[in-house]
UniProtKB/Swiss-Prot annotation:
SUPFAM superfamilies: MFS general substrate transporter. It is a multi-pass membrane protein. Induction: Repressed at high glucose concentrations. GO terms for molecular function: carbohydrate:proton symporter activity; D-glucose transmembrane transporter activity; fructose transmembrane transporter activity; mannose transmembrane transporter activity. Residues 1-30 are annotated as: Disordered. The keyword Coiled coil does not apply. This is Low-affinity glucose transporter HXT3. Residues 1-29 have a biased composition (Polar residues). CDD domains: MFS_HXT. Glucose transport is thought to be mediated by two kinetically distinct systems, a glucose-repressible high-affinity system and a constitutive low-affinity system. Its main location: membrane. PANTHER family: GALACTOSE TRANSPORTER-RELATED, PLASTIDIC GLUCOSE TRANSPORTER 4. It comes from Saccharomyces cerevisiae (strain ATCC 204508 / S288c) (Baker's yeast). The modification Phosphoserine is found at S23.
Length: 567
């Protein structure tokens, strides 16, 4: 084959959509690319499988619905943005901290780590236990229940007077709710969104996280000059508004057609597909989509109810898929994003910024607008290319950030005044890092796991994968104060090494799923397609007569030629 590997040519992956199949088919068949050439069979298949509603407003309805569901990410982002400021606010320190001999208040490293990071443990447990509600009562009702649990946790936190462990318990309970949201929101979006926009719409979940972080920073900045509990109780009180908005939004969102088919509600599933695609319920396109979903559900039923063990022993390739989901979610945390977002205020103090709350807002702005860019890149360049290039970009940023912090920040030794130029350089490259993270790994980790698993094990697999994310979030959140106290900005080299590993892992283990239905992704795994050749894979119903499926399953070249050479 003469196709170029994903690393070299992001354009190849970006063209792998159902609307542009001739280009992909020609790569596999060793033929020149001719966009105007299709065989009659493929053209006929496309006519049925393609949404006939291609006007300017074709996806407005489903986009609005998915943004409402994605608002669950805002709830998590708000917590991340506010807690980073709480641990530096005077009233919070007075109520929940300890007293120095000079009369000032502080939070010990252990207490800081627990207050900040225990939320992640709650999220991990909630993701595993509460995600099952989506299978039992539907994705919408499951989301409403976990939001109510989140509200209970917020009430406990606001009611805390001076007992840090009461606040601690409240964060665990609110974490249970957010953990359920983190599984059910991307799941519902991926099952409702048309395949042409699934990557973009699932990425809206991450966009809402960044918006929550940014507005959380802004709220902390607005309340920091108060001398009483307004500093932290007002940001917490606003959580009620976000939760009620999400519950209200659920009344307008259609239920997952895949869940409805599984529950035997075929007419409701047809209506859901009709609503999100803006096509009449009796249109052949809706019937075709419904038949594909029904076939998938029937196949799952024939195999019986899924056990947890099936995540590692099931077919096709469930062990590989489960481990890939766990690794991608783990590596998203090991990018080091929460080093900046949880402890951004502390980091800015360390580099000599005069108003660390104000500078945190800069992070929030960069994060939000960079994530807006990801809504374009995720479906334009594909999942693999974004993850690969994102890892390279973050490695470069960490090299500069850590090196300047270690060698130039304190020219006269730590504690003897910092270099303003070095501090500014570190802030700039921290912003570059956030751009690389927010446009690639931040949203695409959720996109990948929402597309990877078949329906019968989806809630279990996604909950395990996101639990790995929360577990690493806890470890990073808890141990960061100790690690930075011991090795300071050498910490950046740790995350740099993780990103080097992430690059190689993605190249060899993560396939391209852009432009495929959830059922087609399952077929691709069943065929054993090599991840670095997966961008050239074509669904069975759309293959030409000369399609060489076997060529995508074998590669005898040395690894360096797989990665950098032409096939």
């Amino acid at each position: 084959m003469n196709s170029t590997p994903d690393l070299i040519s992001p354009q190849k992956s970006s063209e792998n959509s159902n609307a542009d199949l001739p280009s992909n088919s020609s790569q596999v068949m060793n033929m020149p690319e001719e966009k105007g050439v299709q065989d009659d069979f493929q053209a006929e298949a496309d006519q049925v499988l393609t949404n006939p509603n291609t006007g300017k407003g074709a996806y407005v309805t489903v986009s609005i619905c998915c943004v409402m569901v994605a608002f669950g990410g805002f709830v998590f982002g708000w917590d991340t943005g506010t807690i980073s400021g709480f641990v530096a606010q005077t009233d919070f320190l007075r109520r929940f901290g300890m007293k120095h001999k000079d009369g000032s208040y502080y939070l010990s490293k252990v207490r800081t780590g627990l207050i900040v990071s225990i939320f992640n443990i709650g999220c991990a447990i909630g993701g595993i236990i509460l995600a099952k509600l989506g299978d039992m009562y539907g994705r919408k009702m499951g989301l409403i229940v976990v939001v109510v649990i989140y509200i209970i946790g917020i009430i406990i936190q606001i009611a805390s007077i001076n007992k840090w462990y009461q606040y601690f318990i409240g964060r665990i309970i609110s974490g249970l709710g957010v953990g359920g949201i983190a599984v059910l929101s991307p799941m519902l979006i991926s099952e409702v969104a048309p395949k042409e926009m699934r990557g973009t719409l699932v990425s809206c979940y991450q966009l809402m996280i960044t918006l929550g972080i940014f507005l959380g920073y802004c709220t902390n900045f607005g309340t920091k000059n108060y001398s009483n509990s307004v500093q932290w109780r007002v940001p917490l009180g606003l959580c009620f508004a976000w939760a009620l908005f999400m519950i209200g939004g659920m009344t307008f969102v259609p239920e997952s057609p895949r869940y409805l088919v599984e529950a035997g509600q075929i007419d409701e599933a047809r209506a859901s597909l009709s609503k999100v695609n803006k096509v009449a319920p009796d249109h052949p396109f809706i019937q075709q989509e419904l038949e594909v979903i029904e076939a998938s559900v029937e196949e799952a039923r024939a195999a019986g109810s899924a056990s947890w063990g099936e995540l590692f022993t099931g077919k096709p390739a469930m062990f590989k898929r489960t481990m890939m989901g766990i690794m991608i979610q783990s590596l998203q945390q090991l990018t080091g994003d929460n080093y900046f977002f949880y402890y951004g205020t502390t980091v800015f103090n360390a580099v000599g910024m005069s108003d660390s709350f104000e500078t945190s807002i800069v992070f929030g702005v960069v994060n939000f607008f960079s994530t807006c860019c990801s809504l374009y890149t995720v479906d334009r360049f594909g999942r693999r290319n974004c993850l690969l290039y994102g890892a390279i970009g973050m490695v470069c940023c960490y090299v500069v950030y850590a090196s300047v912090g270690v060698t130039r920040l304190w020219p006269n030794g730590e504690g003897n005044g910092s270099s303003k130029g070095a501090g500014n350089c570190m802030i700039v490259f921290a912003c570059f890092y956030i751009f690389c993270f927010a446009t690639t790994w931040a949203p695409i980790a959720y996109v990948v796991i929402s597309e990877t698993f078949p329906l019968r094990v989806k809630s279990k697999a996604m909950s395990i994968a996101t639990a790995a994310n929360w577990l690493w979030g806890f470890l990073i959140g808890f141990f960061t104060p100790f690690i930075t106290g011991a090795i300071n900005f050498y910490y950046g080299y740790v995350f740099m090494g993780c990103m080097v590993f992430a690059y190689f892992y993605v190249f060899f283990f993560v396939p391209e799923t852009k432009g495929l239905t959830l059922e087609e992704v399952n077929d691709m795994y069943a065929e054993g397609v090599l991840p670095w050749k997966s961008a050239s894979w074509v669904p069975t119903s759309q293959r030409g007569a000369n399609y060489d499926a076997d060529a995508l399953m074998h590669d005898d070249q040395p690894f360096y030629k797989k990665m950098f050479g032409k096939k």
